[in-house]
């Protein structure tokens, strides 16, 4: 049986793979596993969602499951994922649930569960919740023991007060176009940026349940780039459906990805003495240009597997203060337990305001190396990289690249494919080397 939990919770097409029945079972299982026993007060969970149409159905089902196990729910409504993580801690809840499929298309949805303190669950806890889902319900409470539901009327205001601390200086001189992806950022992001003083021009901020991520947001940057140039804005910020990501656009309409944002923030934090151990945590997907920029600044880069959960684990283990992904998940542990796109946007604009420099100028140390990616279909993606001819081809490319590039072989998480990625000083070199290794992989079929 396939594992329910992926790298970011449980996801699927709503009402097909992710049914109301499964959502109720997940809510009940989370309540049984995470609801604290022996507490003097009633147990409580925080539940939020993004605005996609299926969210209301799944929210009702999750809450029903939670209530069936005698746990109360604080319903916070449509809010960003990092808001739910923060409020789980702020309300001293037993756990939190976010109903969202992030940047995925509207028909999809997902369920993310946060443990006490708003932290993402470890594999062992997810496995136990999954076991409880398959076991089905046990003995359930009746009467006064059934969980109750309360709407948390102050949820948005509490979250906005929290993220407002990320703006360490006033942003009155900045004009920013904000692409809210018709998602959970649509209300929160413009309010947060205006509260810090910025002149905010929101786009794609009218969610109707059906238009989330529809040719907008952090996975479709073209409209934002055009709007920044058209309005003569200082920058643009793009969020995804649940606002845990932030990508940027400079005044010329050029995209500033998560790697470049991390470089800007790492250098700022190093200058302020806030970059713990002079270390940045990122994943294997970050461009070699990030590593070169950090090396020039004397900043160590710790590399993890793909997924913000692995970045979070490394941040917690090493007590580091900045990490993230090329996709725009940027984590500042002093502000939260997960990536927060609004915090990222505020910190980026604060750096611009403090220095008086443009975003393009601040991002200049990040020189992205040309990258070539080739997908190779294979019979066994788990073992092909260990074949001696493939290892020899990789070793030869690594020797030729030295410190001027890199090669990465990675099995796809969803397809029977191995991805061959090469970065080099020029695209022709990267392509030649990628083809060479891809041919060695293909020969193993």
UniProtKB/Swiss-Prot annotation:
Its EC number is 5.4.2.10. CDD domains: GlmM. Binds 1 Mg(2+) ion per subunit. It comes from the Bacteria. Its cofactor is Mg(2+). The modification Phosphoserine is found at residue 102. It catalyses: alpha-D-glucosamine 1-phosphate = D-glucosamine 6-phosphate. Coiled coil: none annotated. SUPFAM superfamilies: Phosphoglucomutase, C-terminal domain, Phosphoglucomutase, first 3 domains. It comes from Mycolicibacterium vanbaalenii (strain DSM 7251 / JCM 13017 / BCRC 16820 / KCTC 9966 / NRRL B-24157 / PYR-1). GO terms for biological process: carbohydrate metabolic process; peptidoglycan biosynthetic process; UDP-N-acetylglucosamine biosynthetic process. It is an enzyme of class 5 (isomerase). HAMAP family: GlmM_B. This is Phosphoglucosamine mutase. GO terms for molecular function: magnesium ion binding; phosphoglucosamine mutase activity; phosphomannomutase activity. PROSITE patterns: PGM_PMM (PS00710). The active site is at residue 102. Catalyzes the conversion of glucosamine-6-phosphate to glucosamine-1-phosphate. Belongs to the phosphohexose mutase family. The keyword Metal-binding applies.
